[in-house]
Amino acid sequence: MAYLKIVLVALMLVVAVSAMRLSDQEDQDISVAKRAACKCDDDGPDIRSATLTGTVDLGSCNEGWEKCASFYTILADCCRRPRG
């Protein structure tokens, strides 16, 4: 009898969790910004007055982009398209 109760409770939990899941469209509407602006080395000394010309890329810079900041992070790089 105890096993039957455990099975019923487990089934109820599975139904409750699956009913609360968001549909795929709602998942796509909740998006996280994948890129943000960052300060390249030649943007100026002050972060408040500098124009942020770089873009934060997770991992490393995309193909055709260059790393524009001298500092090193494991998770992301400050990158921009080559000038010219």
UniProtKB/Swiss-Prot annotation:
GO terms for molecular function: sodium channel regulator activity; toxin activity. InterPro entries: Myo_ane_neurotoxin_sf. Its main location: secreted. GO terms for cellular component: extracellular region; nematocyst. Coiled coil: none annotated. SUPFAM superfamilies: Defensin-like (SSF57392). It is found in: Secreted; Nematocyst. Keywords: Cleavage on pair of basic residues, Disulfide bond, Ion channel impairing toxin, Nematocyst, Neurotoxin, Secreted, Signal, Toxin, Voltage-gated sodium channel impairing toxin. The keyword Secreted applies. Disulfide bonds join 38-78, 40-68, 61-79. It holds the Pfam family Toxin_4. Gene3D superfamilies: Anthopleurin-A. Residues 20-33, 84 form a propeptide. It comes from the Eukaryota. The keyword Secreted applies. Residues 1-19 form the signal peptide. Binds specifically to voltage-gated sodium channels (Nav), thereby delaying their inactivation during signal transduction. Belongs to the sea anemone sodium channel inhibitory toxin family. Type II subfamily. This is Delta-stichotoxin-Sgt3a. It comes from Stichodactyla gigantea.
